[in-house]
């Protein structure tokens, strides 16, 4: 779950921080993780 999303990054509920390059967004979010528009995956 996303706790906070801003133009330069995302803070997930579990405390993970992911810095995002300009223009990159979350395209898919589930209980297991997130997929970003640049193809990166974040697992939680």
Swiss-Prot record:
Organism, as annotated: Cancer pagurus
Name of the protein this chain belongs to: Cuticle protein CP463
InterPro entries, per database record: Cuticle_1 (IPR012539)
Pfam families reported for this sequence: Cuticle_1 (PF08140)
The entry's keywords: Cuticle, Repeat
GO MF annotation, one: structural constituent of cuticle
Domain of life, per lineage: Eukaryota
Sequence repeat segments: 3-20, 27-44
Expressing tissues: Calcified shell.
